[in-house]
Amino acid sequence: MAGIVMMCVGVASLCVNDALAKTLTEGYSPLQIQFMRNLIALPFAFLIAFRMGGTPALRSHRPLAHLLRGTLWIAATFMFFTSIMYLGLAEATALIFVAPLFITAISAMFLGEQVGWRRWLAVLAGFAGVLIVVRPGGSTFQLVSLLPVATAFVYALLMLSARWVDSRESVWTLLLYLTATGALLSAFIVPLVWVPVRLDDVWLFVGIAVFGTAGMTLMTQAFRLAPAVVVAPLDYTALLWATILGWLFWNEIPDAMTFIGAAVIVVSGVFIILREHSAIE
């Protein structure tokens, strides 16, 4: 039960993180938001890593792997923050959910993993759901709608890149170095887009760091306390939170086609999770 609660709270925290980021995009570049988020979150990530894993969690055996992961993290976050400047929170969130489909496809095509025909059908169905949401060629189509899909692809690469990290490193080490490399790499570019931070916005930057770090920590703990097949599908509750937050703060109400496409994506993703679990067993 604790794992389920942690997963639900963690997902909700990340949705608040996204809502705060959307608010900040009204006055700041996505790159500056990302830099500030990682910079403020770094002390929290350090303390969490030390508390959960001790001194060994602070050391990396493959720093270049973390550098690559940090680059992917910056790219994914930048594209997503850019997308929510123009798209509704629920629409962008729904499209992000194709990440598990990308993971399955990449694993099969490039990593030699065995993927049965049922999972391939689920992947195809999920991408059909993307077409329903994006509606290319339609009057409502926006090119920026492809950014969350690109974000999902890069995020899939980020998840798969965890395999290149030394097996002796804990998830807390990964969290710490992801935050640290994200802050370091974005620091080189952020002067190009930097604007002075208004005093009234400081709490928003602190909030995005706190909720983002808390969300990642709680979700990590959830997978440690409960079977993945139980907690992983709860990630899709983000669509509910994104819809509520988008409606409350921006009066965003997704249309019927967006909900239909999102439902297809979610069902496909959950099916893949369940099939992968049964294959492992």
What are these regions (language model features)?
Residues A2, Y28-A75, V154-L158, Y177-L192:
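Transmembrane alpha-helices of multi-pass small-molecule transport proteins
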Residues A2-G10, A49, T55-M79, L143-T151, ...:
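Loop-to-transmembrane-helix transition segments
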Residues V11-V16, F46, G70-F78, P100-A105, ...:
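Hydrophobic/small/kink-forming positions within alpha-helical transmembrane segments
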Residues K22, P30, G137-V197, L204, ...:
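Transmembrane alpha-helical segments that form core, pore/gating elements
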Residues S29-P43, T82-A99, F141-V154, R198-G212, ...:
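Structural signature of hydrophobic alpha-helical transmembrane segments
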Residues M36, T93-V98, V165-A180, T217-W247:
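Helix-helix packing/entry segments at the starts of transmembrane helices
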Residues F80, A99-L121, L240-F259:
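C-terminal transmembrane-helix exit sites in multi-pass transporters
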Residues R118-R135, T151, M257-E276:
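Hydrophobic transmembrane alpha-helices of multi-pass small-molecule transport proteins
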